[in-house]
Amino acid sequence: MKNILQGAMTALITPFKNGKLDEETFEKLIKRQIKNGIDVVVPVGTTGESATLTHNEHKICIEIAVNACKDTNVKVLAGAGSNATHEAIDFAKFAQSHGADGILSVAPYYNKPTQEGLYQHYKAIAESIDIPVLLYNVPGRVGVDILPSTVFRLFKECKNIFGIKEATGSIDRCVDLLAHEPNLVVISGEDAINYPILSNGGKGVISVTANLLPDYICELTHLALDEEYTKAKAINDKLYNINKILFCESNPIPIKAAMYIAGLIGNLEYRLPLCEPSSENFKKIEQTMKNYEIKGF
């Protein structure tokens, strides 16, 4: 299966207005990403607060993303994860039937399945659809690690599982995956290590920072993929401070604050249990942003 889901990808935030999904702003944010050269948009992932969306809201976000990207070269990698396999399959089937180019499926959270359980979970999802599936490994959030042996097994046996978004924070893990399976598509899931992963064989990034600075992330990613490593590293170094401050509290708390400060969202709203950043961190975010040129709509 030819992989078209790589390069510079944005883990989209989900804007709210008076407690409800702000569909108009969400569409505008996606069109801003398209305008600034992003390759793939990723709605309803961790950054999109998928855990606190209703199933209907989740599906609406996918529809908006697909419609916004229609007649463009930008692809949609739809979040379709759940800790219940039957729910993940429902999201996956919806994404496929509504035109998504692939799905991002986070490891089941809270119930801590075994490696065999993870294998069966992902195999069932992959067999339920025909579009590409990107595994999503983020043990710090979900409580379970998709071990390399399980990744290789799934990659070998499921034709539409093409790679993994690695958010372990470990460059060594990514290098090990690629050393044992060079055809596996490894995507960086942490902005702090985008450059090291790209320069060691990674094929793209799913970036939180790209919500705010899509042009920077596009340039960094494309330069690295073209093996222009000196230029890519210079951009990566410039992004160091913003990448750091955007994770001063749990994602997506800081990035939504930054988007609000930049005037890209009109309301600073979260779904509980997420809440606004501390006043101290809000000021730090605001101060750090002054060092970057942030493009509007």
Swiss-Prot record:
Record-annotated membrane-spanning stretches: none
Principal EC category: lyase
Record-level Gene Ontology MF annotations: 4-hydroxy-tetrahydrodipicolinate synthase activity
EC number: 4.3.3.7
Cellular compartment(s): Cytoplasm
SUPFAM superfamilies: Aldolase (SSF51569)
GO BP annotations listed: diaminopimelate biosynthetic process; lysine biosynthetic process via diaminopimelate
Keywords, comma-separated and alphabetical: Amino-acid biosynthesis, Cytoplasm, Diaminopimelate biosynthesis, Lyase, Lysine biosynthesis, Schiff base
Cystine connections: none
Catalytic residue list: Y136, K165
Subunit annotation: Homotetramer; dimer of dimers.
Family label: Belongs to the DapA family.
The name this protein goes by in its record: 4-hydroxy-tetrahydrodipicolinate synthase
Gene field: dapA
